[in-house]
From Swiss-Prot:
This is Orotidine 5'-phosphate decarboxylase. SUPFAM superfamilies: Ribulose-phoshate binding barrel. Belongs to the OMP decarboxylase family. Type 2 subfamily. Keywords: Decarboxylase, Lyase, Pyrimidine biosynthesis. The gene is pyrF. It comes from Clostridium tetani (strain Massachusetts / E88). Pathway: Pyrimidine metabolism; UMP biosynthesis via de novo pathway; UMP from orotate: step 2/2. It is an enzyme of class 4 (lyase). GO terms for molecular function: orotidine-5'-phosphate decarboxylase activity. GO terms for biological process: 'de novo' pyrimidine nucleobase biosynthetic process; 'de novo' UMP biosynthetic process. Pfam families: OMPdecase (PF00215). The active site is at 97 (proton donor).
Length: 288
């Protein structure tokens, strides 16, 4: 199961999930001049980042919107990036946030768990109901794939829906989390975590301890570190015995060269940022 592989990769490399949310604006101008089209520019930039960080990250997350926005050339760069990571025995989370009725969800599952865009994990939205998640189960059972479902997200607007309370006082995100935890019991890996994970932002530390306790067997994809204000000590609250989650950073890693004022060595700067982030999180875990 991919969840077991991810768990082991966290044990080996740490908790960093490097986000390849690659915009042309993020790429140094000198690097762009080396290639003739946007597909090659983006893929080769990604390749440099992957090569520089592979041994220090748990996984990579690719936000598909950045590639869809460029049309076919962007999707070709997306596919080449997926293929390159898989050839390197890396782990990929495709951030697609799909959520639709069962018949449509079957097509999304087919699109991203086999064929040209096959990946290891995808992100899903639960807000059309849990039957919108069930079509992915076949691939979880037969191919060991995994999903991360939106539970408590890191954006400010999350409170508009996720904080709505039911009659018994439970918030929407709490209800969703518990339902997903129950569904996940059929997909537990040897590591003790389920192939049904949750997206839980680290910008709400007042909820962290309760979430981790209530959702004990759920592996977390944790956004919000760095640019959105989440700190390593916040992240540590969402982990369990030093594992149970990966922490995503996209701009912080891709644009590290700007902070270090060294665009010629952008990949090395990204590696340095991954190592800094990894060590920051490990120190917070050990201090907890």
């Amino acid at each position: 199961m991919m969840i077991d592989k991810l768990y082991k990769r966290v044990e080996k490399n740490g908790h960093v999930c490097a986000g390849l949310d690659t915009s042309l604006d993020y790429i140094p101008e000198y690097f762009k001049t080396k290639y003739f089209n946007e597909e090659d520019i983006i893929f080769n930039f990604n390749k440099e980042i992957i090569d520089a960080t592979y041994d220090k990250v748990a996984c990579f997350k690719i936000q598909i919107a950045y590639y869809e926005a460029l049309g076919l050339k962007g999707l070709r760069a997306y596919k080449r990036t997926l293929d390159y990571i898989k050839e390197s025995d890396g782990i990929v989370i495709s951030d697609i946030k799909r959520g639709d009725i069962s018949s449509t969800a079957k097509m999304y599952a087919r699109a991203h768990f086999e064929g040209d865009f096959e990946t290891d994990f995808i992100t899903l939205s639960p807000y059309m109901g849990l039957d919108s998640i069930e079509p992915y189960f076949e691939y979880m059972k037969q191919k060991g794939k995994g999903v991360f479902v939106l539970v408590r997200t890191s954006n400010e607007g999350a409170k508009d829906i996720e904080f709505i309370e039911s009659k018994d006082g439970n918030k929407v995100y709490e209800i969703i989390g518990k339902k997903l935890k129950n569904m996940g019991q059929d997909f537990l890996g040897n590591c003790g975590y389920s192939s049904i994970g949750g997206v839980v932002g680290c910008t709400h530390i007042d909820e962290a301890v309760k979430l981790r306790k209530d959702l004990g067997g759920m592996f977390f994809l944790i956004p919000g570190y760095g640019a959105q204000g989440g700190k390593a000590e916040d992240v540590a609250l969402y982990l369990k015995n030093g594992n149970g989650g990966v922490v995503n950073s996209s701009r912080g890693i891709l644009l590290a060269y700007k902070k270090q004022n060294d665009e010629k060595n952008f990949a090395k700067c990204s590696r340095n940022e991954v190592i800094r982030m990894r060590d920051d999180i490990l120190q917070a875990i050990n201090s907890k």
